[in-house]
Amino acid sequence: MKINYPLLALAIGAFGIGTTEFSPMGLLPVIARGVDVSIPAAGMLISAYAVGVMVGAPLMTLLLSHRARRSALIFLMAIFTLGNVLSAIAPDYMTLMLSRILTSLNHGAFFGLGSVVAASVVPKHKQASAVATMFMGLTLANIGGVPAATWLGETIGWRMSFLATAGLGVISMVSLFFSLPKGGAGARPEVKKELAVLMRPQVLSALLTTVLGAGAMFTLYTYISPVLQSITHATPVFVTAMLVLIGVGFSIGNYLGGKLADRSVNGTLKGFLLLLMVIMLAIPFLARNEFGAAISMVVWGAATFAVVPPLQMRVMRVASEAPGLSSSVNIGAFNLGNALGAAAGGAVISAGLGYSFVPVMGAIVAGLALLLVFMSARKQPETVCVANS
């Protein structure tokens, strides 16, 4: 099989970004001790990263949209590398917080511009698969990068974890430099015109679908450990094993979602959102034993990430006049869904409904996303996305 080097370079960048985004979750106690703060305070580093993604996605895309995409992507990975180096040498909590925010500024714009580049280096009928290939780096980070960074942080120190992640940034920059076509600098964008594109009803509908799709995922994912402990009576070792299986499911779903979205974006969204609803409604029953829990986590992970490539392609299609900005904003929408999903799951727990109802709430959110897809599909027939290089 012929290797598509531009897609490989984008996947390497995605792997690094996924590693730096998720690895602090497993290192919070170590980081908290290192900068002399409480674990909840250290948890704010994760929230700050998410906020930085939402702010940085449109901001960095607009600032870099007149530059050649290769140089823009390399610049974004330079920010990533610098942010991780500064995190590794941060002398105190506030410096670490600012370093994490700096690191996050590349996230949305990289995936947004990267999606456009990925779609431009393959034939039109393979664009969704190309976008999925880039996101495969993100899913593989959950299987390999995050556990490796966590192990490194636990054994050598959390600072070494950030330094190693910075090394991934250097590898990514070199890969992008040698694999992507140079391209010329584009015209400076008309900001008002591109923002007007985002205000179209069909674009807002697509972005809202992304928020709800991500919200369904994070309603459960945020509380996966206590949910499994409550339903399955899982040990910490078993929970860790389930997180690995979820990562495997992410990779399977990402691949299937990309392949099927090449045929039909809306059809893929309908099918996997329905599967996501069904499996989350079934988890309170299936996960009562370890085997059922393992099967549930793989299927749930696959259904969850299978909607990512079609959601990204859907926004790029309905906002084809501003593909870079729209796809970057869509990454911000994923992070907004992250926050809303965590809030929805937290509301269930705070209301005393029990951890078994958390996946049910996720199914309700997925149902809202599915309803929105059906409504939008009636008004907006599928069109072919043309990504210009």
Swiss-Prot record:
A single GO CC term, please? Answer: plasma membrane
Top-level taxon of origin: Bacteria
Q: Which PROSITE patterns match?
A: MFS (PS50850)
Question: What biological processes does GO assign it?
Answer: transmembrane transport
Task: Give the Gene3D superfamilies listed for this entry.
Answer: MFS general substrate transporter like domains (1.20.1250.20)
Q: Where are the transmembrane segments?
A: 7-27, 44-64, 71-91, 101-121, 131-151, 160-180, 204-224, 237-257, 267-287, 291-311, 331-351, 357-377
Q: Does the keyword Lipoprotein apply?
A: no
Q: Please state what the protein is called.
A: Inner membrane transport protein YdhP
Record organism: Escherichia coli (strain K12)
